[in-house]
From Swiss-Prot:
Annotated GO MF terms: rRNA (guanine-N7-)-methyltransferase activity
Role of this protein: Specifically methylates the N7 position of guanine in position 518 of 16S rRNA.
Keyword Transmembrane helix included in the entry's annotation: no
Biased composition (Basic residues): 244-254
InterPro entries (UniProt xref): rRNA_ssu_MeTfrase_G (IPR003682), SAM-dependent_MTases_sf (IPR029063)
Residues annotated to bind S-adenosyl-L-methionine: 90, 95, 142-143, 157
Top EC category: transferase
Family: Belongs to the methyltransferase superfamily. RNA methyltransferase RsmG family.
Species in which this protein is naturally found: Kineococcus radiotolerans (strain ATCC BAA-149 / DSM 14245 / SRS30216)
Span list, region Disordered: 1-21, 230-254
Residue spans of biased composition, Low complexity class: 9-21
Top-rank lineage group of the source organism: Bacteria
Descriptive protein name: Ribosomal RNA small subunit methyltransferase G
Subcellular location: Cytoplasm
Amino acid sequence: MPEGDGVPRETPSPSVVPESPVEVPVEAVARVFGDRADRAATYRELLATAGVERGLIGPREVPRLWDRHLLNCAYLGEVIDQGSSVIDLGSGAGLPGIPLALARPDLQIRLVEPLERRYTFLREAITELGLRDQVAVARGRAEDVRGEFSASVVTARAVAPLKTLYGWALPLVVTGGHLVAIKGRSASDEIAAAGETLRQMGVTAAPEVLSVGPDDGTGTTVVRVARGHGPLRAATAPAPPGAAKRRPGKGNRR
Ligand SMILES: C[S@@+](CC[C@H](N)C(=O)[O-])C[C@H]1O[C@@H](n2cnc3c(N)ncnc32)[C@H](O)[C@@H]1O
C-alpha cells in the first residue's frame, strides 16, 4: 500500500474535495475486474460522491481510489482459495470486501460493520452494483456476531492492530480457515507485538507475511494467520497498571 500502514486517512470536510482529473489504470482494471470493470467504476464513483459526502472516505483519497483502494483491496484475492466464504470485518465503505467481490465472483462475502451510516451505505452500494446474490451486509461489532456468522476467511483492513484483531476475527474463522489482514509496512512489527496473544489463544501456526499485487506501489503486504483445528482460547488481557493493588469492593465501580 502506498503509505504503508493500511489505515485510511482522516475525513476532512467535503468542501475541500480536489477537482483534479482521475487517471484510470485501464489495463490493471481490466485484468483484475474483467467483465465487472464497469461495476468497479460505478463503485469508485459511489465512493467519490456519496462516500465523500457522508464522510466515509476522505476527499484527498478521491484521486487515488483506483490504486490505493479498489485495486489494492482486490489483490487480496491472490491469497484466498477458490469458492471460499468470506467475512469482511469492519468493512467501512466496503473495503476490502466490495472490490474483492467484484474481482472474485466465486467468493461469497458478508460485510460486517457496526456503524449505521456505513451499514446503510453498504446496503445501498451492493444493491446498486447488483451484488445482492454474492454479498450480504450485517450490522454489528465482531464481538456481537460471534456464534452467529463464521467463514473460511475473515478479511480486515485498518480495523485494529493484530493484537486486538486476533481476538475479534479468529473466533469468526472456521477451523482450518484463515484471517487475512492488509497491514502494509507495519506487518512485521504488529506480528511481533501480538505473538503472546496468539499463543494464549492456542494458535500454533506462525503468521505468514505475503505480498499481493504488482510491485508498482498498488500492491500491499498481507498477514495471513491459520486458525488451525484445535479449540480457540480467550486471550488474557494484560492487567491495567495498578490493578493488582486495588482492594476488592473498594473503588472498583465502572
Ligand atoms: C478505519 S475504518 C476502516 C474501514 C475499511 N476496512 C477500510 O479499510 O476503509 C475501521 C472500521 O472498523 C469498524 N470497527 C471498529 N470496531 C469494530 C469492531 N469491534 N467490530 C467490527 N468492526 C469494527 C469501524 O466502524 C470502521 O468502519
